[in-house]
Amino acid sequence: TTTWMPTTVTAPLEDIYKAIANVAECKDTLNSARILGMFIEGPYITSKHKGAHPEEHIRPLNKEEIEKMSEYNTVKSIIIAPEKEDAPKFTKWITQDLKIKVSLGHSSANYEEACACFDMGADAGVHTYCAMEQLHHRNPNLLGAIMTRNDVYAELIADGIHVSLPAMKILLQNKPKDKALLVSDAIQGTGLKDG
């Protein structure tokens, strides 16, 4: 690994702010893999597809909170669920004014809600297949938007556990090669040692 992004999960806001400040303080001083910036995964997600995120800290989109997260110029990407109130407006503001990338995930959004956020500047679907509604022929939802839009990245946890090999092949055969991102999603709960 040469570059990585420390990632927060849904937590009390003060813990998220503290994590951002800590990364800002040390990101240019480490003699190791380069920290690109921070990825804020939650708290602006949906309870139905929260995954490992604690439900009690899931929040509505809030301008003041996001502005505070951006103060250190350390946050480079944030997840939002596109069904959140005013999500397209927030997406445009975050991407254009704050210059932070918006990814969509942990969501129950329908296709139209997802496309509205992609149209406003969101550029990726996070954990494709996971923590979202599954593809349905009458409601292709967020997954359908990720698969059919060649202007957005599909982030895929390609560990063979989160997503089956045939499902990975379906996605990779339907996305331009430069729009598929393979990621790890390892957290302490995997039981693996550091590294």
Segments the model singles out, each with a brief description of its role:
Residues 113-195:
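Active-site-adjacent C-terminal substructures of enzyme catalytic domains
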Residues 1-19, 33-46, 72-83, 100-101, ...:
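Divalent metal-dependent hydrolysis catalytic cores, especially in the metallo-beta-lactamase
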Residues 11-13, 46, 52-56, 84-86, ...:
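Short, small-residue-enriched loops and turns at beta-alpha junctions
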Residues 19-22, 61-63, 137-143:
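Charged helix-capping and loop-helix junction motifs
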Residues 27-33, 97-99, 175-176:
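Short helix-capping segments at alpha-helix termini
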Residues 46-71:
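Conserved phosphate-binding/catalytic loop of the ribokinase/pfkB sugar-kinase fold
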Residues 1, 69, 94-95, 117, ...:
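Generic structural signal for hydrophobic
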Residues 68, 76-82, 87, 91-132:
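Extended, charged catalytic domains and RNA/DNA-binding interfaces, predominantly
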